[in-house]
Amino acid sequence: MPTLTTVAKAKEMADDTRVELKGKITKHIRSDHYEFQDASGTVEVEIDHKVWAGQTVSPQDTVEISGEVDKDAWSTEIDVKRLKLVK
């Protein structure tokens, strides 16, 4: 399991690096893409339907996500493999 990191640090990591982040899903962008935010900044995340596992998350809820950095020439996003609502 990767150690908790920040959005700012995750954006600097290599493609396919496993990351775990704690923060909030602040808005829906399109399809299965969302904006994730922590104290260091924001990053686009991709969360497939099955990863939600029936959980309902609002922008006020804190979540932990784990997945992989997905980098291309223009952007960095996180491909989320696990999402957990923090109570």
Annotated model-derived regions:
Residues 1-87:
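OB-fold and OB-like single-stranded nucleic-acid-recognition modules
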